Amino acid sequence: PQRQIKILMITTPNLNRVFIRKLQKVCRHLNFANGQVLIQDYNESFYYYALSQQPETFLHDVVLFDYTESDMMSCCLHRNLHTTPQVITLEQKNNGKLLDQKDEQFKNIAEQIIAGQVVSSVYLIGDGFDGDWMKTSLQYLCHTRKVFLGKNLYSKGACYAGFIKDEKRDWPFVYIGDNELKLNLYLKVLIRNEMQFFTLITAGESWFDAVGECEVILDGTPEIEVWIQRPESREAHVELLELTDMVERERRTTRLRITAVPESDCKVKITIRDLGFGEIA
């Protein structure tokens, strides 16, 4: 029964908005609560799996070779050690089919992918790696690197993701993929007489699911400052939103609800609603 399920993780090769909406509709029909079902693609599952292993396995870059289908796919995980949190990027490539002399072909592909990089570990997944055909290619991969062979990496990565997201475990990484938000949005607000930044949107979250909302009391001029920061940068720029056609009231008697809803991975729609006079519920 779904009431016994704390988090349901779903991982799939690719995501799009139509698929997400249909899946969310099915989950609502099955009485899953909002936030109980989390969806991610295979790339994100690889990211969570690789960085949930022992630190020495991702001291440098990590490479995945996926031979599940007829084509040999590769994915390289890179960490930016100069950002906080560390920004993770994945470089994916379709290397085509392995025909005759598979061992030599795969060795050539591996050499091209790894060239110029320091790689700590390599993961080999998919039925295509079955059999005893890897000889020189495996010897090359195992030189100064850890190599792992298996078939359930994506499902395990989804489980790691569910644990990390649900338990709010310390996670010093942020993954910026095709479906992840490429910006942070903040509001500068006064909380208990202390000026703080309130996070509306967080980079690295899936733009399909992310939403930010808060209620504030307007103090002073009718305008809102939105601070926008790219995850790879320590600098932020400010967008000033002027609130026009508002009812004039005395200072600190205007209550606003601010809602941020992503429209893509790099575009966010902000709606500001005048709630009138009163206390914040």
Task: Give the label of every model feature segment.
Residues L38-P55, V147-L190:
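Glycine-rich phosphate-binding/hydrolytic loop that grips phosphoryl groups
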Residues E56-M73, H78-N80, G126-F129, I176-K182, ...:
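A short acidic Gly-Thr/Ser loop motif
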